[in-house]
């Protein structure tokens, strides 16, 4: 298995900007891969993606220096093993709320003796000599549970102490929903920012990395300065819609009298 460039980047003390693929299109993935992202995540939870479209996106991105991640739809070992066999270099897993759930996630991502992942990297192991992938996969694949509920915050220390995770990823929408707020990104409430500060402090203490989903480049930059080491900006469909709306509005701003 080739080295995980995102893992190497983190070890060098650098942050990473992450793209997000909701559109089930190899061409969309290819276009995104040319845009300078350090990593790109295929979203199987809320994106319009399935396993076949995920593999097609991976194939389209293969020529570009982006680390390929997947957000799985749930903490289920069959799904997790399948996306890793398909070539994912990391798993972002939603709704990890307890130590036991986190341990199950790690086990599903790691080959024995560190875990229970079944051997069969049908695509991931297709490059290199037989057995080479299995020798390095445990050291290269990133395991990233999502922190997005009040229960996860209550169990944060226990989750972060689970051996084998590489960091955590904040889902601000579900987290704020769990805290009784309207779900949205780029929160400014002091109580939410205090939660982020705690996450950064506790991950740093353990040599782990914190990631967060953002809506805007400005907020993402703030999060990097505050200590997050993986920031996602919206997703491909959101970026497309934003650019399209701005283009249409820009035309009418120039010639509004013709409308």
Write out the residue ranges for each language-model feature.
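Expand to "…catalyze enediolate/carbanion chemistry for C-C bond making/breaking, isomerization
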Residues: 1-259
């Amino acid at each position: 298995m080739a080295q995980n460039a995102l893992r190497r980047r983190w070890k060098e003390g650098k942050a990473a900007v992450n793209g997000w693929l909701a559109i089930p299109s190899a061409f969309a993935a290819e276009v995104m891969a040319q845009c300078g992202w350090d990593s790109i995540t295929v979203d199987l939870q809320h994106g319009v993606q399935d396993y076949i479209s995920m593999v097609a996106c991976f194939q389209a991105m293969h020529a570009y220096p982006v680390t390929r991640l997947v957000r799985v739809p749930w903490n289920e070992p069959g799904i997790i093993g399948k996306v890793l066999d398909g070539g994912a270099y990391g798993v972002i897993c939603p709704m990890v709320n307890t130590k036991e759930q986190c341990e199950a996630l790690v086990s599903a991502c790691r080959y024995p003796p560190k875990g229970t992942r079944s051997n069969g990297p049908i695509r991931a192991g297709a490059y290199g000599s037989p057995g080479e992938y299995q020798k390095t996969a445990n050291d290269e694949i990133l395991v990233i549970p999502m922190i997005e509920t009040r229960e996860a915050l209550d169990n944060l220390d226990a989750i972060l102490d689970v051996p084998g995770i590489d960091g955590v990823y904040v889902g601000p929408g579900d987290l704020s929903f769990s805290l009784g707020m309207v779900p949205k990104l780029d929160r400014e409430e002091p109580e939410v920012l205090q939660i982020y500060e705690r996450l950064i402090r506790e991950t740093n203490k353990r040599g782990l990395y914190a990631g967060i989903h953002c809506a805007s480049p400005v907020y993402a930059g703030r999060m990097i300065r505050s200590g997050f080491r993986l920031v996602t900006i919206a997703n491909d469909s959101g970026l497309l819609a934003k650019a399209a709306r701005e283009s249409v509005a820009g035309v009418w701003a120039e010639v509004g009298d013709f409308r």
